[in-house]
UniProtKB/Swiss-Prot annotation:
It is a multi-pass membrane protein. GO terms for biological process: apoptotic process; protein glycosylation; protein N-linked glycosylation. The lineage of its organism: Eukaryota, Metazoa, Chordata, Craniata, Vertebrata. Residues 1-30, 74-92 are cytoplasmic. Keywords: Apoptosis, Endoplasmic reticulum, Membrane, Transmembrane, Transmembrane helix. Belongs to the DAD/OST2 family. Pathway: Protein modification; protein glycosylation. The gene is dad1. Residues 52 are lumenal. Subunit of the oligosaccharyl transferase (OST) complex that catalyzes the initial transfer of a defined glycan (Glc(3)Man(9)GlcNAc(2) in eukaryotes) from the lipid carrier dolichol-pyrophosphate to an asparagine residue within an Asn-X-Ser/Thr consensus motif in nascent polypeptide chains, the first step in protein N-glycosylation. N-glycosylation occurs cotranslationally and the complex associates with the Sec61 complex at the channel-forming translocon complex that mediates protein translocation across the endoplasmic reticulum (ER). All subunits are required for a maximal enzyme activity. This is Dolichyl-diphosphooligosaccharide--protein glycosyltransferase subunit dad1. Component of the oligosaccharyltransferase (OST) complex.
C-alpha cells in the first residue's frame, strides 16, 4: 500500500512541476506559508492559551481570510479556468485581491482594538 501511495505522490509532484505555470507555483508557496502561519497560531493557542483573545482572533482571522482570498486569486488566474473568467484579466484579479486584502486587514486591525 505504501508503494502505491508513494507512486501517486511522486506522479503528482512530477506533473505539478512540469505543467504548473510559475505564477501559480509562487501563489501556492504563499498559500503554504499562510497555512503554516495559521496552524502555528492555532497550536500556540492550544499550548499557551488565548490571553490576549482579540489578538489571537485577529491573527487567526487574518490567516484564514488571506488564505481564502489567495485561493480565489489562484482560481481566477489559472489558465485552465480562463473560460469561466473571460471578462477578468489576471491583472484585474490581482487588483481585486489587493483591494479585498486591504479591507480584510483594516477590519483585523480595527478588531485588535
Amino acid at each position: 500500500m505504501s508503494v502505491s501511495v508513494f507512486s501517486v505522490v511522486s506522479r503528482f509532484l512530477d506533473e505539478y512541476v512540469s505543467s504548473t505555470p510559475q505564477r501559480l507555483k509562487l501563489l501556492d508557496a504563499y498559500l503554504l506559508y499562510i497555512l503554516l502561519t495559521g496552524a502555528l497560531q492555532f497550536l500556540y493557542c492550544l499550548l499557551v492559551g488565548t490571553f490576549p483573545f482579540n489578538s489571537f482572533l485577529s491573527g487567526f482571522i487574518s490567516s484564514v481570510g488571506s488564505f481564502i482570498l489567495a485561493v480565489c486569486l489562484r482560481i481566477q488566474i489559472n489558465p485552465q479556468n480562463k473560460s469561466d473568467f473571460q471578462g477578468i484579466s489576471p491583472e484585474r484579479a490581482f487588483a481585486d485581491f489587493l483591494f479585498a486584502n486591504t479591507i480584510l486587514h483594516l477590519v483585523v486591525v480595527n478588531f485588535i482594538g
